[in-house]
Amino acid sequence: MLLVIDVGNSNIVLGICDGTQLVRNWRISTDKSRTSDEYGVLLHSLFASAGLGFDTVDAAIISSVVPPLTGVMEAICRDFFHLTPFVVGPGIKTGMPILYDNPREVGADRIVNAVAGYEKHKCSLVIVDFGTATTFDYVNARGEYCGGAIAPGLAISLEALFQRASKLPRVDIARPPQIIARNTVNSMQAGIFYGYVGLVDEIVNRIVAESKDTPRVIATGGLAKLIAPESRTIVEVDDFLTLDGLKILYERNR
């Protein structure tokens, strides 16, 4: 089976693929202070809870936007699974032209999402990935990655408000009961939540206008299901887009 690993700034998402099927997946917190041994022990516990052994994995692929942890994940694959993983980066076969000024600058997760989105839909796309940063990526109808936009993530925005405004409390990310809120917590949630919905729709609409296209807009990432129902532009949420993209890239490079 194939182990797919997506290392983000806030979370590490792992999956086990058996053929074309994603059979198990886990989400753990990103911690740059953890060693490969510590992550290995954690993975052993996750595998055991799923009734799996490390010997069921015979291949692995890694996407990482956290350079200090890329080597840690490679070490886990070598030391615990006894294999050399593929790492998404320069030189890997994507099957997708990257129309970026410097293709090496594009985050691995953005390329993985673009590859998966186009492979699944075979049409022009805007992919919105809600992570520590929220990324907007445009793929044209020819399957070319054209670039996009990066915005501060929802959690970062909320944390900045708490840190910089002395009298405002730290609040959870949530859809408030109404936009005209009657207490401070709901007022903050209303401003952040609906402000962010507006940010998403405005950026998508500008991408659509600039591209002179009618792309399908899909969302992924931890907060996609929270934002998408209020968005006027997002038509689909794909929770496993990145893991599916890693599986596709593995098949193209094996």
Swiss-Prot record:
ATP binds at D6, V7, G8, N9, S10, N11, I12, V13, T132. Keywords: ATP-binding, Coenzyme A biosynthesis, Cytoplasm, Kinase, Metal-binding, Nucleotide-binding, Potassium, Transferase. Substrate binds at Y100, G107, A108, D109, R110, T184. Its cofactor is NH4(+); K(+). One of its GO terms (molecular function) is metal ion binding. One of its GO terms (biological process) is coenzyme A biosynthetic process. The gene is coaX. Coiled coil: none annotated. This is Type III pantothenate kinase. One of its GO terms (cellular component) is cytoplasm.
